[in-house]
Amino acid sequence: MANHKSAEKRIRQTIKRTERNRFYKTKVKNIIKAVREAVAINDVAKAQERLKIANKELHKFVSKGILKKNTASRKVSRLNASVKKIALA
């Protein structure tokens, strides 16, 4: 265990940040999974609706500093491509 006050504080901060990061990472995964599920069943309307939500949420995470800009853009771009693919088919 920590012997210094500053080390104890760092442990508390790490625990708090870990919980917060886990929450956001799970949320990102669930958002992406929702779009992919709609694409898998070829439901264009649902996929486009969920893509719109995913785009908004992922860019919100960028502004909060949870995701990097390029990471969010890459994820949105790939989701967009998959939705576009079923829309044209």
From Swiss-Prot:
Molecular function terms, GO-annotated: small ribosomal subunit rRNA binding; structural constituent of ribosome
Presence of keyword Heme: no
Presence of keyword Ion transport: no
Transmembrane segments: none
GO biological process assignments: translation
InterPro entries cross-referenced by the UniProt entry: Ribosomal_bS20, Ribosomal_bS20_sf
GO cellular component: cytosol; small ribosomal subunit
Keywords: Ribonucleoprotein, Ribosomal protein, RNA-binding, rRNA-binding
PANTHER family xref list: 30S RIBOSOMAL PROTEIN S20 (PTHR33398), SMALL RIBOSOMAL SUBUNIT PROTEIN BS20C (PTHR33398:SF1)
NCBIfam families, alphabetized: S20
Described function: Binds directly to 16S ribosomal RNA.
Family: Belongs to the bacterial ribosomal protein bS20 family.
Name this protein carries in UniProt: Small ribosomal subunit protein bS20
Species, as recorded: Helicobacter pylori (strain G27)
Chain's gene name: rpsT
